[in-house]
């Protein structure tokens, strides 16, 4: 099982742990719904796709926030904002690279 989510749904996805989960893939996580994210301490892989110019949690800020998380990669989509208008292909490519 791969757990995925976008924006606040990404926050919910990162709050879930279960033995059936193989990895997490999130797009534009805001990291503001909860004070603690269960996935942060989990050794299974996490990929957080971030917009460089996200209005709610810019990529640089997100990278700092998850620096201590286990087995976590942040993929930055340059030129994109929280809604990834015109940058959807970059999301598809990032997810494809993770799943390849």
Predicted region positions:
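Acidic catalytic loop of the alpha/beta-hydrolase fold
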Residues: 52-57, 82-83
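Hydrolases whose catalytic domains are alpha/beta-hydrolase-1, hotdog thioesterase
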Residues: 12-16, 35
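Catalytic histidine neighborhood in serine/cysteine hydrolases
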Residues: 67-83
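Gly/Ala-rich beta-loop-alpha elbow adjacent to hydrolase catalytic centers
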Residues: 4-13
């Amino acid at each position: 099982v791969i757990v995925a989510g976008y924006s606040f749904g990404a926050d919910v996805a990162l709050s879930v742990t279960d033995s059936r989960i193989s990895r997490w893939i999130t797009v534009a996580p805001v990291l503001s719904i909860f004070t603690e994210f269960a996935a942060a301490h989990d050794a299974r892989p996490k990929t957080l796709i971030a917009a460089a110019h996200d209005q709610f949690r810019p990529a640089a800020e997100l990278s700092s926030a998850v620096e201590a998380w286990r087995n976590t990669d942040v993929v930055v989509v340059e030129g994109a904002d929280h809604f990834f208008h015109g940058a959807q292909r970059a999301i598809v490519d990032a997810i494809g690279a993770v799943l390849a």
